[in-house]
């Protein structure tokens, strides 16, 4: 990483997201944009299910800075366009979802699919191709079991492919378990995490704070 993209690790609950990673199916080293938990209210109590780290290719800073440099973390966290620019930007992204509580692949994949479809219907972008991508995703993930500490990894190419990988510990494999060639679905997975109705407001806050500082110190 260049000095202009100097980043630190982030700890969420008992899990540490390192400052840089080399994702599966990628030749590049990505930096940690931010990380946070994802939880739900269960019978009146907030329960944390996963922790999520979002990594970006270094060129993301060069792409985003001209528009967003000078904005505070508070301004970025409330900007739908800022997170949309991250989701759709022409650079590689990598998302690691680590499980705090055990979930079956069926439970996890059906919730992701539900959120993606809701996003597409809300934006009028639901398509047959997107629906087929979701079916493939459900088939890839449904037989998995995610115990505490396990992860599902998403490597998102700017060309549109989504590489899905699984790991039971801190490791990251070089190759993925499956590839889905559908840009709409690839973007929707990240959109439903950090977009306008994203499931992890904590990750959004972390990204806004860290990226605001990176822009401030960037040469772009």
UniProtKB/Swiss-Prot annotation:
GO terms for biological process: flavonoid biosynthetic process. It comes from the Eukaryota. InterPro entries: CFI, Chalcone_isomerase, Chalcone_isomerase_3-sand, Chalcone_isomerase_bundle_sf, Chalcone_isomerase_sf. It is an enzyme of class 5 (isomerase). One of its GO terms (molecular function) is chalcone isomerase activity. Keywords: Flavonoid biosynthesis, Isomerase. Substrate binds at residues 50, 115, 192. Signal peptide: none annotated. Pathway: Secondary metabolite biosynthesis; flavonoid biosynthesis. The keyword Cell membrane does not apply. It catalyses: a chalcone = a flavanone. Its EC number is 5.5.1.6. Part of the biosynthetic pathway for all classes of flavonoids, a large class of secondary plant metabolites, many of which are brightly colored. Belongs to the chalcone isomerase family. Catalyzes the intramolecular cyclization of bicyclic chalcones into tricyclic (S)-flavanones. Responsible for the isomerization of 4,2',4',6'-tetrahydroxychalcone (also termed chalcone) into naringenin. This is Chalcone--flavanone isomerase B.
């Amino acid at each position: 990483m260049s000095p202009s993209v100097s980043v630190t690790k982030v700890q969420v609950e008992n899990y540490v997201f390192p400052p840089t990673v080399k994702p599966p199916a990628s030749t590049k080293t990505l930096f940690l944009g931010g990380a946070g938990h994802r939880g739900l209210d269960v019978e009146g109590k907030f329960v944390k299910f996963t922790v999520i780290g979002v990594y970006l290719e270094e060129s993301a800073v060069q792409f985003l800075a001209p528009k967003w440099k000078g904005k505070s973390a508070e301004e970025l966290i409330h900007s739908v366009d800022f997170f949309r620019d991250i989701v759709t930007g022409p650079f590689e992204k990598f998302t690691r979802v680590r499980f705090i509580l055990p979930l079956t692949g069926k439970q996890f994949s059906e919730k992701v699919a539900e959120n993606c479809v809701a996003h597409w219907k809300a934006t009028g972008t639901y398509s047959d191709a997107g629906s087929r991508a979701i079916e493939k995703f459900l088939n890839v993930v449904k037989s998995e079991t995610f115990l505490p500490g396990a992860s599902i990894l998403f490597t998102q190419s700017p060309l549109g492919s989504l590489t899905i990988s699984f790991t039971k510990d801190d490791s990251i494999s070089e190759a993925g378990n499956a590839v889905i060639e559908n840009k709409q679905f690839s973007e929707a997975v990240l959109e439903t995490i950090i977009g306008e109705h994203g499931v992890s407001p904590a990750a959004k806050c972390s990204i806004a704070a860290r990226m605001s500082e990176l822009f401030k110190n960037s040469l772009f």
